[in-house]
Amino acid sequence: MLDAYRREEMNTWRDYIDSARFEISDLRFQILLYEYGYCGYIVAEAKKEGKEALMPEAKARVQHFKSHVTRLASQLPVGHYEMYMSAVYVYELRLHESIHPMKSMSLAKEATKLAPQDPLVLSYYGTCLFYAPKPFGSKEEALKWFEKAEKYFEGDEWRYCWVREANQMYIGQCKEKLKYL
């Protein structure tokens, strides 16, 4: 799956998610992480000019992801429910289904308080700050969170995680953008 991420073959992720039997799978948390990534991808694609036909799929994927997050709420690692629901609100905002920017940021911040050493949570919050409008975030602030996440990504369990690679990419992008400020 990491190779598919590197090659930007997101249809591989879609096929994996679609073929997984979420309700009975021991890999529910892994599938949820892929759904989180795929939703971000498909929402971004649907917003591109000439790709409006993807909008129904994007909306359906976000709702499906939201239902999985809600169903697993009590079983998710500390801070992950808040992280994933924050992402849902961002996706819905991008799809113009509802406006939740403050609720999204609030949940992302809450996730960092609940799980201050969880690299997924820290990286997600960095992503929120990276894309947030000036009053709510900055590349400089995002970089701090990405670098903090990177410290916790150092174990073997994260070696092949797509979020770790995305985190490293964001560190580079932040440093590049800050160089020109």
Describe each PLM feature range.
Residues 2-8, 41-61, 90-101, 132-143, ...:
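Short coil/turn connectors between adjacent alpha-helices in alpha-solenoid helical repeat scaffolds
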Residues 23-47, 77-95, 117-131, 159-178:
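Amphipathic alpha-helical repeat scaffolds of TPR domains
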Residues 22-29, 53-56, 67-70:
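Short, basic, low-complexity termini and linkers enriched in Ser/Thr/Gly/Pro
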Residues 1-36:
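Start-of-domain marker
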Residues 19, 72, 110-111, 149:
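Canonical positions in the second alpha-helix
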Residues 102-106, 130, 136-157:
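TPR/TPR-like (Sel1-like) alpha-helical repeat modules
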